[in-house]
């Protein structure tokens, strides 16, 4: 959420930023209009309350002077004023509800260093690591390899749940768990994160504070009875962990790593990545999350991104880092790096992690503050990143580590977790 005062004082700057993101700018005019109406109503209510208070004092004075008839007239006026106040307060609530909703619909402002562009085609490649493997045989796509080895069952998953679900079997299911444990061990032991296992169901307030609502309502699974939401990412739970709290300066940065399944309706992705495990309604992810100060958040993004990269490096999976342009930024992000891993079946790089600095966007939505060295209250800056998407990491291993005789070699770092060197 953006600061209302900042919007009021810098409407043109905000509009220019929204234009760079390919967003409509009329919402800023609506916000300013609601804000002006709100301030006008507040002034009217304040004036009437002052008049009512003055009348109360006058009534007491008149009664002391035995002027009961005059006092009764003032009392009647007071009741009329109270009714006016009640009506204006009702109008004020409606205006404030509309204003707050509009504020929740405004995306974050891109950082000054973000490349300007319309869509993913104008993202900027920052660096590459590793070299795609040159096969001396025709590599198989993970969906074919997994089916032939009786490790992936798409048909029975569809029978159970419909499209975009997968059953993992045998050693490939164990490899999924090995990846999760490997990532958690790396981030806690080497990178200093605190491990969290959060709830998968959260309240509307929680998922609103992270930025998923109201914009992504159609992409979320929701319970009809209790109005609870299944998380689309552990970022939702971690961003709400300290909602309505004030953190001490010396406690920052707070660094959390969480493992959860993630649930997404993928409402806008019809026809995309229809085969295999790349785009699923349910998938496992290890999430990295920081709470820090405005002074440290830019450098924190570089550090968080390097932590996600380390997973790929230790697994010896070729990847590239891409800086997202303004038109491809996520709703809550001020700056984002995507990590894209090489997949032979696509003969291309595919996203496996998205690392973002949201600045005070989530802190303001969740009312999460900290006391600085001068004991002043400020909103925290938050950062998030996949460390990594487990299913896509599994896919990358299957495709990049496959052998000519149809087996899957296990990366060296995962052998201690698996107790074997090959699957198949």
Swiss-Prot record:
PANTHER family on file: SERINE--TRNA LIGASE, SERYL-TRNA SYNTHETASE
Biological or metabolic pathway of the protein: Aminoacyl-tRNA biosynthesis; selenocysteinyl-tRNA(Sec) biosynthesis; L-seryl-tRNA(Sec) from L-serine and tRNA(Sec): step 1/1
The name this protein goes by in its record: Serine--tRNA ligase
Alphabetized UniProt keyword annotations: Aminoacyl-tRNA synthetase, ATP-binding, Cytoplasm, Ligase, Nucleotide-binding, Protein biosynthesis
SUPFAM superfamilies, per database record: Class II aaRS and biotin synthetases, tRNA-binding arm
EC number assigned by the record: 6.1.1.11
Biological function: Catalyzes the attachment of serine to tRNA(Ser). Is also able to aminoacylate tRNA(Sec) with serine, to form the misacylated tRNA L-seryl-tRNA(Sec), which will be further converted into selenocysteinyl-tRNA(Sec).
Primary subcellular site in the record, as a coarse category: cytoplasm
Gene Ontology molecular functions: ATP binding; serine-tRNA ligase activity
Keyword Protein biosynthesis: yes
Catalytic activity, as annotated: tRNA(Ser) + L-serine + ATP = L-seryl-tRNA(Ser) + AMP + diphosphate + H(+); tRNA(Sec) + L-serine + ATP = L-seryl-tRNA(Sec) + AMP + diphosphate + H(+)
Binding of L-serine, residues: 233-235, 287, 386
Top-level enzyme category: ligase
Gene of this entry: serS
Domain of life of the organism encoding this protein: Bacteria
GO biological process: selenocysteine biosynthetic process; seryl-tRNA aminoacylation
Family as reported in the entry's similarity comment: Belongs to the class-II aminoacyl-tRNA synthetase family. Type-1 seryl-tRNA synthetase subfamily.
